């Protein structure tokens, strides 16, 4: 996101997208906030053309039905009231840092970012700094980017290639790519017991779906990654084969709001009619959505408007005919269209500040192939629209920033279709108590 000087923006601009789709944008002087006039339903109808054989087409196959007459749309939870202090209590945030963010799996990046031996990336958030390094045998190692001597970051750069060792820029302590301390200048001046067999503190690391996941609890205490994701999501989300996709774009926002407020927006679809100006067809489709609780995580499936008449079929394929939405506790959201995927990750920086990442994944192919070129053109058009939709979300975060400490904001009134918000925070409460 670019901070635009007040005198340097045009109030309205027009961009012509493929397929004669027109997108109107209004640029705010403090942040580019996009008002999408193109309706999602119209774009979805455009997408329903011939399937492109040159890319992977996710299909339900033998997986359980997630939409249709035999599927219960909502669990029995009901409306509720929720205390608003969860967004602004600094003591609670410190407990979340320790007992939630410090014990659960979180995304650190894409596997393709560290393809070669010695390639590394860093993860920074909630006062932690982690290095992830590809080893010569193809495995990954991860450790806290903190020198054991006096505490500065061992690795200054956020990413790099082909490292064999890392040297702390302060006093030159040297670590190998697994975080083992292998060199201390003037070692004889240190107490032997103080520097024997020490190294950077290790972090649990794993790969699934083409993503790198880390767990700050460490290799000995972290639950297995796939156990945390759970079989329902690993199988259902796995049908999209994210490991075969490529990273097209990453957008980052610095948002002055609690990270859980961002997750809340992905745990309901009640807002899409008003905030995203969704037309009646899409609003109708959201009423047929199904919501599923699976362990600590959630799944939601919204049928595309053009497929509503097929919902009566027991063989309805939600992968090909709906938007598939997965929330992996505590802060990872997968928004899957059949053609491409957006991954949202709000990383807390403090109790009321969040680094909000949006990753766009597409299927690879040859741009010289007319079929793939058509797929790419259509997908990029949709991505431009979705960036506008996220811009609308950002505009609401701005409004929430104005009122987050107001004496009038003490509780939230939640409908039964917002039950995932209540359950998410109940789950957070349990993790803190445990």
Labelled PLM ranges:
Residues 134, 139, 145, 204-206, ...:
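C-terminal catalytic domain of Rieske-type non-heme iron oxygenases
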Residues 108, 154, 181, 409, ...:
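Short clusters of hydrophobic/aromatic residues that line enzyme substrate/ligand-binding pockets
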Residues 103-113, 184-188, 325-330:
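Short Pro/Gly-enriched beta-strand edge/turn motifs at strand-loop
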Residues 53-158, 203-206:
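N-terminal pre-ligand scaffold of iron-sulfur
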């Amino acid at each position: 996101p670019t901070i635009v000087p007040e005198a340097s923006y045009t109030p309205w601009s027009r961009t012509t997208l493929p397929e004669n789709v027109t997108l109107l944008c209004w640029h705010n002087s403090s942040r580019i906030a996009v008002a999408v006039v193109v309706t999602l339903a119209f774009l979805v109808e455009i997408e329903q053309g011939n399937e492109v054989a040159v890319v992977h087409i996710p299909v339900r196959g033998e997986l359980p039905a997630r939409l249709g007459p035999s599927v219960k749309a909502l669990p029995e939870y009901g409306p509720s009231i929720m205390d608003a202090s969860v967004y602004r209590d600094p003591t609670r945030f410190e407990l979340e840092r320790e007992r939630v963010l410090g014990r659960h799996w979180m995304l650190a990046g894409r596997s393709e970012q560290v393809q070669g031996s010695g390639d590394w990336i860093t993860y920074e958030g909630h006062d932690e700094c982690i290095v992830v390094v590809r080893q010569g045998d193809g495995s990954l190692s991860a450790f806290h980017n903190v020198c054991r001597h006096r505490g500065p970051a061992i690795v200054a750069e956020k990413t790099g290639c082909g490292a064999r060792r890392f040297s702390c820029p302060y006093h030159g302590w040297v670590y190998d790519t697994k975080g083992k301390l292998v060199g201390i200048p003037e070692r004889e001046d240190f107490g032997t017991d103080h520097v024997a067999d020490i190294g950077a503190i290790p972090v649990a690391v794993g790969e699934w779906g083409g993503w790198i996941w880390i767990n700050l609890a460490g290799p000995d205490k972290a639950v297995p990654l796939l156990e945390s994701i759970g079989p329902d999501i690993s199988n259902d989300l796995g049908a999209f084969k994210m490991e075969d996709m490529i990273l097209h774009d990453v957008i980052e926002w610095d948002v002055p709001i609690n990270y859980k407020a961002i997750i809340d927006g992905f745990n309901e679809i009640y807002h899409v009619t008003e905030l995203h100006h969704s037309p009646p067809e899409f609003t109708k489709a959201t009423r047929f959505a199904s919501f599923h609780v699976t362990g600590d995580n959630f799944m939601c499936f919204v049928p595309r408007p053009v497929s509503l008449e097929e919902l009566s079929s027991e063989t309805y394929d939600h992968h090909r005919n709906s938007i598939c939405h997965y929330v992996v506790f505590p802060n990872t959201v997968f928004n899957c269209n059949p053609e491409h995927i957006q991954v949202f990750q709000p990383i807390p920086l403090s109790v009321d500040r969040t680094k909000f990442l949006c990753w766009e994944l597409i299927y690879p192919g040859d741009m010289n192939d007319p079929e793939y070129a058509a797929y790419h053109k259509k997908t990029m058009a949709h991505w431009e629209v979705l960036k506008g939709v996220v811009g609308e979300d950002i505009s609401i975060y701005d409004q929430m920033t104005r009122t987050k400490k107001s004496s009038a904001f003490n509780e939230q009134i939640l409908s039964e279709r917002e039950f995932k918000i209540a359950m998410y925070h109940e789950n957070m409460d349990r993790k803190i108590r445990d």
